[in-house]
């Protein structure tokens, strides 16, 4: 049986209204908008948060949002990005990656494909074979004619773009062409030398961007190894906000300190706000707190403050999780740990756990169509709803600081839960009655298969002992 002890906290300004999607969310989700704030524990943290976002800010705001699969697909991030850019101005699309070359699912905003042979590494790998950059993935090719291709489902809006391609630039780097829409920009040895010593190649381009392609070309005067970390689209001038989606499916908290190539890249991108939005892959399989979490958070905070001493570090919670017939009660302990670390390191804290219904709520989200059948990942409308809460939590916090300019803290007491595990018979009823298999068809990916069965890429990988997302037609996969 579940009991919630409600705790009383100080008066806060009224919650701002949500859009139509929020109004349509059923009461059974147990949403609690009292937690729609970014909590802070010192006056300094409040000042830094306000300075990062307020509309009179002279410089653009740069947001890094690290996380796992819920960030990689960009449903939540897209919702938050568009709403925040409507408030503060659009400084550009931000970073994109070629997920096709990394053999994984792409963002909802673009198709990313490749030609030729590419090797890849990802931040959830314990010993990645390539250096990792800020996006948590790296791809590399030594094949003449190999290509990275992007087709944007909605063109990147017309502007004076500064396009930066983060890639190695040394004696091993081959010549390559960049094709934006139908315009080709060659990067031969002379052109590449202009950017020698920098972690990127740069193009200024005016107009909308419908497609982008990088082609490796043959040249006797260049190398053969192209190592790629991501492409950044920002406006050449003006303020506004840029929101970088830096998700890697299956990544745990400690993945963020495995990004060896990130320091140089982060200095260029200069983050003002950094979300460390992990946890699911730390607690899901063991229902305990991982001993690596504290160390990873501390190292990440130290690193980002070395780049920007006033950076706002956002520590978040997981949502409620249900796995193999059991409620993952460690979500409560993870919430408490993130709040304690936020207080200890002068960060801000976003309590999505209590905001989204708290312990033992995810199955109701599934019943209402806001969570997938695996009771780990949300559906499209579930992630959209979460993105709306990110936006409104920012606006509510700014309003609170404006109305309480001398406030040194904004702390909302977390909910307390008493939970009794289901009986063995109840657990048995919740499990599938038999194993299920799927035979891979031509053109299918782990992502499309996981969506078909309401599962996840990571779950299918684990169930079948797959070390990568590479599959082939005729392969038999266990689905449950």
What are these regions (language model features)?
Residues 135-143, 257-292:
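Oxyanion-hole/transition-state-stabilizing segment in secreted/luminal serine hydrolases
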Residues 238-242, 248-253, 280-291, 318-333:
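Serine-dependent acyl-ester chemistry module
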Residues 422-462, 467-479:
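Primarily a LysM-type cell-wall glycan-binding module
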Residues 1-4, 9, 17-66, 70-242, ...:
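N-terminal secretory targeting modules
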Residues 62-66, 73, 92-97, 242-247, ...:
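Structural recognition of the beta-strand scaffold that forms the well-ordered cores
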Residues 321-420, 427:
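Catalytic His-Asp segment of secreted/periplasmic serine-dependent ester chemistry enzymes
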Residues 275-281, 302-335, 344, 351:
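Active-site segments of SGNH/GDSL-like serine hydrolases
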